[in-house]
Amino acid sequence: MAGVRLVFTKAFMVTVLLTLLLNIGVKPAEGQFSACNINDRPHRRGVCGSALADLVDFACSSSNQPAMVKRNAETDLDDPLRNIKLSSESALTYLTKRQGTTNIVCECCMKPCTLSELRQYCP
């Protein structure tokens, strides 16, 4: 094979490089987002339950925004949407995990969160 010269194009080299990187476990950056799993346990510094609700209330009131308030039962009865019913199949779609979503329990109970993250949940 003397005298054989291999010529590689840029596209070929990029393909080979990406293939090697993916095979050794290097993954593209996905940002700071991480979803919670049903099997996750609360973080030791996470805040959960009524303590989390109180903390959000405090964070929202300390940022000059109106605090979260519990709804009144009478107000719930006046809700024009209260008589709308969904089929079981349709209702279950709301319970399945949606890709790319997170919530306050995931952000502040399953792991510790910042004041800035808490304030994102102010009404």
UniProtKB/Swiss-Prot annotation:
Tissue: Expressed in the cerebral light-green cells which are giant neuroendocrines cells involved in the control of growth.
Gene3D superfamilies assigned to the protein according to its UniProt record, in alphabetical order: Insulin-like (1.10.100.10)
CDD domains in alphabetical order: IlGF_insulin_bombyxin_like
Annotated SUPFAM superfamilies: Insulin-like
Subcellular location(s) per record: Cytoplasmic vesicle, Secretory vesicle
Pfam families assigned to the protein according to its UniProt record, in alphabetical order: Insulin (PF00049)
Identification of the protein by name: Molluscan insulin-related peptide 1
